[in-house]
Amino acid sequence: MNKEEDLSMFFIDTSRHGQAVYDPIVNQSLDNYLINDLALEGHGLIMYINAPCVIIGKNQNAYAEVDLDYLEKNDITLVRRTGGGGAVYQDYGNIVFENIVVGDTSHYGDFSYYAQPIIDALTALGIEGVQLKGRNDIVVDDLKISGMSMVKVENALAAGGTLLYDLDTQQAGRVLTPNQDKLKTKGVKSVDKRVSNLKPLLKGDLADLSTEAFKEALLKKIFHTEDLDSIQRYTLTDEDWAIIDQRVADFYGKDEWNYGSNPGFHYYKTAYYPGVGTVAFNFNISDGVITDFKTYGDMSFGQPDQVDQAMIGKTYDQDGIAAGLKAGNYQDNIGKLAIEDLVSLILN
């Protein structure tokens, strides 16, 4: 495929010398390279499988979301994505899909637009009741099979998510349950139990497909073909991989990015808001004044650190907290929430 071709949708082959790449840190860094460097004009799609890992959103507190001791003991990699969203466990029974769009970003924020090809493909494979529910979840009869996130950089965006095919759901529940003894306060969100794998829902010849074989079947439905060799594609070159490898070494593979810091401030308040997701505040108070403040959550947009800076020095009362939230442009940087709800969360 020529880089200058203007295609409505094409496949970006992320295999390396013909071999699938399962390293989650490498795979998670792909969208940044594809958007900022390669920048293929049009609508591209990547699809891959990760080795066991936990992916967290860019604004999440790893120490509050994940049992890090359990990860280390079980050789599970922690990876931070460049977009928002919640914490998810992935393994060889999970498929990741990502739309890489350069040029026309008019559908930014529209999860239904990027979910529809997946919904149509699953329906074509005989799975009934597939639909988008809420802001960014794909469900089958109210059981979650996919969560999506989105990030935009100038004239490009990445919009994608996961598909639970044959995921070890017991492992997922275990790894996303934080070690409460290591937290100074409670209030960590619970793991969503209403999830489902797709494999038990398939019938006939499809019922025993491996994850790789199911991924291939899904791609055939998405591109409306029985021969994937016939679809328009771009295959990553050695030059592409050299840049990706350097980015991983310099940034995406470092603990400073993936783990972040754990402020360990005394107060930790968290709540879930429909349409926005989880919002959490970690802060200290001295003599009735907020001295330290850190915002976490599932938010994909804005700059929560603006709220953090605005809250420091404000009085720990209704008026002071409201003033800090307003000064930090909380609706742009946290979500479209009533200020009374956030003030109540921080105070109570």
Segments the model singles out, each with a brief description of its role:
Residues 64-87:
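Active-site cofactor/substrate anionic-group-binding motifs, chiefly glycine-
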Residues 17-18, 81-87, 103-105:
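A short glycine/serine-rich beta->alpha loop
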Residues 45-48, 88, 129-132:
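Short beta-strand
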